[in-house]
Amino acid sequence: MAYIYALIFAIVVCMNTDVIQAEESQHDTLENVEYRLSCIPKGGECERMADPCCPGLQCLGGNPFNKENFGKCKCQ
């Protein structure tokens, strides 16, 4: 009989743990979506290395020796 109670208790604990983990992963997903919406996509103009290009991209370009191209960087 104790075995059955222990089994039921283990199932309930596992179900509650899964619900908590699902809520945390959903929260992380919402944060990631907000970040992706605010980041600069590939080919988008940026001004400096610290600008928030999307993951895997960097703010590159802009030739300081060319007056026409100075400060025109893009997320690549």
Swiss-Prot record:
GO molecular function, one term: toxin activity
Lineage: Eukaryota, Metazoa, Ecdysozoa, Arthropoda, Myriapoda
Main location as per UniProt: secreted
Cellular component GO terms held in the UniProt record: extracellular region
Tissue: Expressed by the venom gland.
Organism: Scolopendra mutilans (Chinese red-headed centipede)
Span of the signal peptide: 1-22
Entry keyword Cell membrane: no
Annotated localization: Secreted
PTM remark: Contains 3 disulfide bonds.
Keyword Transmembrane part of the UniProt annotation: no
Domain of life: Eukaryota
Sequence similarity: Belongs to the scoloptoxin-13 family.
Protein name: Omega-scoloptoxin(13)-Ssm2b
Function per UniProt: Inhibits voltage-gated calcium channel (Cav) currents.
Protein keywords: Calcium channel impairing toxin, Disulfide bond, Ion channel impairing toxin, Neurotoxin, Secreted, Signal, Toxin, Voltage-gated calcium channel impairing toxin
